Amino acid sequence: MVCQTCKCENTKSSFLIRDYEYDFSSVSEYSICKSCNLIYRTHNINDEKANLLYSKKVYKPVKGGFLYDNLKKLNAYYEKYHLIRKVFKSKDKKKIVILDIACGKGYLLEAFAKYKKYICFGVDINYIPDRENIKFIKTDFKNLNIIKDINADIIIINNFIEHIEDINDLYKIINIMKQGSNMIIITPDTDSNARLFFGFCWSGYHAPRHKILFNKNNILKTFSHIKEVNLKTSKLYDPFTNLISYSNLIKEFRVNFSIKLLLKIIITPLLLLMDLLNKNRILMIIEKK
C-alpha cells in the first residue's frame, strides 16, 4: 500500500497490533513509511465493517459509561481552554457556529454549548439525542451537503482524522469551507514518549480502528499541497490515553509473560505523566484563506 502523505511505496518496518480494547484475538498489520514516517494500517476497512466497529452498542465514545464519561468531560474542558486561546479568541463574531465531525457523545461540544455565543452541531454515524444548544445529525462525515448547509466557522476533527480510510475525503471538506473558517484537528502524536515506552501496547494504535497516525512533520506535509489554507501546529496533553496504554500492557502481560513487561507494569504508575512536557497529542489549525 502507498503512503497517503508522500506516496512512497517503501516501508521501514511492518508489525501486528492487537485490538486490546475490544477483541484481543484480532490483529491488524501496520507499516511505517520509509520516507515520512507516517504509520498506517496496511488494509482498508469497508463501510459494513466500520458500522460494526463503531456501533453504539459497543464503541465507548458513543456508548459511554460513568467513569469514561467523566474522564472525557474533564479532558474536554482542557481542550476547550486551548481552543479558545489559540483559535476562538481571534473570532470577534457575536455568534460562532461550531461543527464537530464524528462527535461521539459530544463531550467537547457540551463544553462549548453552555455559552450562548456558540451554536453547536455534531455529526456522527450513530443517533445521538439533541441537547441544549446542540443539534446532532445522524449521517456519515462524507455527507458534504450537510456540512455545506451548516456553514460552520469552526470545524472540529477531534481524534477522528486517524480513523479516515482515505484522506481525500477530508480534503473535500476543506474545499467547501468558507473563507476565514478554521478546521481544528486533534490526533495522537507518534513521536510521543508514550509510544516509545508502551510499544505495541500504545493506545494510539487503537487497532484496527486507526488507519493513519502522524507526527508534527508528516501531518504538515499531508496538507501542505493545499494552497488556499494557512497551517499551524502545536501540542496538547491527554493523560487518559496513557491509562488505556497501561491497561493494554496488563492484558498483554497476562498472555505473554516477560520480565520486560513486568518491569513496565511496575514503573508505569510513576510515569503516567510522562508526556506532560513533551505532550502526546497534535493540535493542528487549518485556516481557510
Where are these regions (language model features)?
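Short, glycine-/aromatic-enriched active-site segment of Class I SAM-dependent methyltransferases
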Residues: I186-I212, N217-K221
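Hydrophobic anchor at the start of a short beta-strand
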Residues: C120, E228-V229
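Conserved N-terminal segment of class I S-adenosyl-L-methionine
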Residues: M1-I150, I154-N158, L170-Y171, S234-L236, ...
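A short, conserved alpha-helix within the catalytic core of class I
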Residues: I164-I173, T187
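A C-terminal cap/extension of S-adenosyl-L-methionine-dependent methyltransferases
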Residues: L16-S25, T233-K289
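A short His-aromatic
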Residues: N159-H163
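Short glycine/proline- and charge-enriched loop/turn segments
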Residues: Y59-F66, F198-A207, Y246-F253
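Short glycine-dipeptide loop
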Residues: M177-M183
